[in-house]
Curated annotation (Swiss-Prot):
The name this protein goes by in its record: Homeodomain-interacting protein kinase 1
Localization of this protein: Nucleus
PROSITE patterns: PROTEIN_KINASE_ATP, PROTEIN_KINASE_DOM, PROTEIN_KINASE_ST
Compositionally biased spans, kind Basic and acidic residues: 61-72
GO MF term set: ATP binding; protein serine kinase activity; protein serine/threonine kinase activity; protein tyrosine kinase activity
Gene that produces this protein: hpk-1
Domain Protein kinase: 147-483
Length: 846
């Protein structure tokens, strides 16, 4: 009695399985809902219809495409559907529903896309028990339904699948016709029994194919399914086996995990999960909406029998290869191999034999546990026991197992030879994240993709655990970070995250409430389009915000309440009245309100003798690191294009004074005023050096610290100390001694003042331990680290200066090489914008 090659299913039937095929016919309910396609391992050496192959140029991947089979005999692959080449990678092109002309029925389609072979054997059975179909043949069911054959879809070891039209309606269905043989009839009973249990569940919610009815046609079992569009293998083949992005793999993984979770709750094992058995429902309306098909190899958990030929080889779990007892966890292994293939565009373990399959697995996963090997019925087929005289922690009883070499296996087996069929050879699963990188010009998009890859590899490793007891379950997979996307929630402003949420919402959305997405061309049935999910609200692009002019008086511009996150970083144009005589002419000013907290905490001030841990410059959250949202609170009017009326520069003032935490705009140095204000160092910076006794006694001098270590308080403290003696000195560079700052005449063009701090080398003398003049800054430029050519700003040395250099004269400023000095007014809130043209930026911002 021949055995079904792709199944190896036991002859023991489920307790709920029918005893005869007539009982099986009555289990399935009559047609009720949507129609989809169901096929199994469709291969066809002899095709009763001429197949239209999709045009396209063959690529290297297409020529090297491995054959998708479970048995080890060579069978030519055949497309499961008529496809057309699509230039769009994200979705496949759906061909129009074929139709056959009929003068007697007004509901019949009016065209046909497949032609039948000329034959006189109508409805004959071949020598292998396969039914020979012809064009326009009508299959009648006992429920009064008639199905007219439209198109041949494919065939396999079980039989064949055709596309048919349900006469009197506009519905297109898929009919699977099994071979006329007792073994296939029994397998059909098992599939009907499982489908009858699934018919009570919501197929749209749990993402598995919907079956409508089962009947006999000339002693052949016929199963009627709803019609689906295209399987994932054909989708990959159509796109030249290009890898799928993670945003496309995620919804597929989510839907298949949902189906496996339902099967696990029913105690069912699919046992043949592969890309051919995951079908795209409607790529145009619902991209990456999939359903699981082919329950011909499925069984109940209690009826699972070891040493059976289950699963296609590329997706076969190690417990099946070794001949161990199995459960629903074999489907999780298969799903892991499927998503790895979608990510790589090539099977992860494309073994040409079971030996190659287990050899590829061991190369990346290591040897299976000893407990598994000792219980394996096929142990000596692939492994060799090695005796050892010195037992250790790696072996039990002085022996261990190793995989046979290729030469040893070929010498012991005459059926199959080892072949290298892998496109990518990995030593560890983590190396998968290093291949198939796409080009992302946006650093935020690249960062999201990199983080997403790490979580994808993490869930993949949990699905490909050798020990089935520790393999991840469907429920745990649905709670993983890769599926829930909790790891990228902080990047909701990125297009990558927006696209990920959009695709997940589409796959969660139920399909159209109609009988089938396939209808005859001449039937004027209104088709309700699938509603597009509302896109989440994003920040307006800058080009859309700039033309908006806001009238402002003496108050600040309030933030837009409907825009979260980066609202206070959006750029606005404002109009101000320039006091030019009696007529106030309008002038545009570039206004940017400051954020509540600076992007960089660039003034973490501490006294060197204070008993406090060191503080370093910390970055803000990733949502504030977008270049287009870097704040520019104060800007030179000459930086903006256009004519500026007289008096505009004098009217330019800081508008966000309350956000900058200063009493009034007049309290901050007017950088563009005719006479800039002068500043002096605060008292705590100009105090004398504390004595060594005080330092070694551990008593910190009574020096006021800036409030909450905030840079804003530094600017305020600097303004309050303007009347005291100045200690500001100008630093030239190198070892040149510092000279007191000489009074200089005022100039018409203002120049921002810059604090330059130095040690008291002159007062300490040449014999002092402090050699050389060194500076520290109160701010750090986050981008620029090149040497500044001139002016009042200097570049700090590339070597960190010991805290003893400054002693008690200067608070403990933490800085990095390449940091720049800033004016105390700058420290008070004038954060530079490194993305502007430096030729127009004031000196203090360089």
């Amino acid at each position: 009695m021949p055995k079904r090659k792709n199944s190896g299913q036991s002859t023991d039937l489920n307790s709920r399985s029918p005893k005869t095929i007539d009982e099986a016919l009555r289990i399935l309910a009559p047609p009720q809902a949507l129609l989809v396609q169901s096929q199994l391992n469709l291969t066809a050496p002899a095709n009763p219809f001429s197949i239209q192959k999709a045009p396209g140029t063959s690529s290297d991947n297409e020529q090297r495409a491995p054959k998708r089979r479970a048995d080890e005999e060579a069978v030519n692959a055949v497309p499961k559907n008529l496809l057309t080449t699509s230039s769009t990678f994200a979705r496949a092109v759906i061909p129009a529903a074929p139709a056959i002309s009929s003068a007697n029925n007004k509901m019949a389609p009016q065209s046909v896309t497949a032609t039948a072979k000329t034959t006189t054997n109508r409805g004959k059975v071949s020598g292998e028990g396969e039914y020979q179909l012809i064009k326009n043949e009508v299959l009648c069911s006992p429920y009064g339904n008639q199905y007219e054959v439209l198109e041949f879809l494919g065939k396999g070891t079980f039989g064949q699948v055709v596309k048919a039209w349900k006469k009197g309606t506009s519905e297109i269905v898929a009919i699977k016709i099994l071979k006329k043989h007792p073994s296939y009839a029994r397998q059909g009973q098992i599939e009907v029994s499982i489908l009858s249990r699934l018919s009570n569940e919501n197929s749209e919610e749990f993402n598995f194919v919907r079956a409508f009815e089962c009947f006999n046609h000339k002693s052949h079992t016929c199963l009627v399914f709803e019609m689906l569009e295209q399987n994932l293998y054909d989708f990959l083949k159509q796109n030249k086996f290009m890898p799928l992005p993670l945003n496309a793999i995620r919804p597929i993984l989510f839907q298949v995990l949902t189906a496996l979770l339902k099967l696990k709750s029913l105690g069912l094992i699919h046992a043949d999960l592969k890309p051919e058995n995951i079908m795209l429902v409607d790529p145009q309306q619902q991209p990456y909406r999939v359903k699981v098909i082919d329950f011909g190899s499925a069984s109940h958990r209690s009826k699972a029998v070891t040493n059976t030929y289950l699963q296609s080889r590329y997706y076969r779990a190690p417990e099946i290869i070794l001949g161990l007892p199995f459960n629903e966890s074999i489907d999780m292994w298969s799903l892991g191999c499927v998503i790895a293939e979608l990510f790589l565009g090539w099977p992860l373990y494309p073994g040409s034999s079971e030996y190659d399959q287990i050899r590829f697995i061991i190369q990346t996963q290591g040897l299976p546990p000893t407990s598994m090997l000792e219980s394996a019925s096929k142990l000596h087929r692939f492994f060799k026991e090695v005796k050892s005289e010195s037992p250790n922690h790696t072996n039990v009883g002085g022996s261990y197992y190793r995989l046979k070499t290729v030469e040893e296996y070929e010498a012991s087996s005459s059926t199959a030879k080892s072949k290298e069929t892998r496109k990518y050879i990995f030593n560890v699963i983590d190396d998968i994240s290093r291949v198939c990188y796409g080009f992302e010009s946006d650093p935020v998009e690249h960062l999201c993709d990199r983080i997403d890859r790490q979580e994808f590899v993490d869930v993949l490793k949990k699905m490909l655990v050798l020990n089935p007891d520790f393999r991840i379950t469907p429920a745990e997979g649905l709670e993983s970070k890769f599926v829930t996307m909790t790891h990228i929630n902080g990047y909701n402003f990125a297009n990558y995250v927006h696209e990920a949420h959009k695709r997940m919402e589409i796959c969660r959305k139920p399909g159209p409430a109609m009988a089938t997405p396939y209808r005859a061309a001449n039937v004027a049935t209104p088709i309700t389009p699938v509603e597009k999910p509302p896109a989440p609200k994003l920040q307006q692009p800058m080009i859309a915000v700039l033309p908006q002019l806001n009238q402002i008086a003496a108050t600040n511009i309030p933030p837009v309440p409907t825009q979260p996150d980066l609202t206070n970083l959006m750029h606005h144009y404002s109009q101000m009245a320039a006091a030019t005589g009696s007529a106030a002419t309008a002038a545009q000013f570039f206004y940017q309100p400051l954020p509540p907290a600076p992007l960089f905490q660039y003034a973490q001030l501490h006294h060197p003798f204070a008993a406090r841990p060191p503080h370093f410059l910390s970055l803000a959250t990733p949502s504030h690191m977008v270049p287009q949202f870097v704040p520019v609170p104060i800007m030179d009017p000459s930086m903006l294009q256009g004519q500026w009326p007289p008096g505009a520069a004098q009217q330019f003032a800081v508008l966000a004074n309350d956000i900058m935490r200063v009493p009034a705009p007049q309290g901050i140095n007017q950088m563009f005023a005719s006479t800039p204000q002068t500043f002096s160092l605060p008292q705590f910076l100009s105090s004398s050096i504390p004595s060594a006794t005080t330092a070694f006694n551990g008593n910190a001098p009574n020096i006021p610290f800036p409030e909450e270590n905030s840079s804003w308080a530094l600017g305020t403290a600097a303004q309050q100390q303007q009347q005291q003696a100045q200690r500001a000195q100008s630093m030239i560079n190198g070892n040149v001694k510092v000279k007191p700052l000489a009074a200089q005449p005022k100039k018409n063009s203002p120049a921002p003042s810059v604090i330059t701090l130095s040690s008291d080398e002159d007062s300490n003398g040449a014999g002092s331990s402090n050699s050389g003049s060194t500076t520290r800054t109160g701010a750090v430029n986050p981008v620029r680290n090149d040497t500044l050519p001139m002016g009042n700003t200097i570049k700090t040395e590339d070597i960190l200066v010991p805290p003893t250099t400054f002693d008690g004269q200067l608070p403990n400023l933490q800085y990095f090489p390449g940091s720049h000095l800033f004016d105390p007014k700058t420290v008070a809130g004038l954060l530079p914008n490194p993305f502007l043209d430096t030729s127009h930026i004031p000196r203090a911002f360089n």
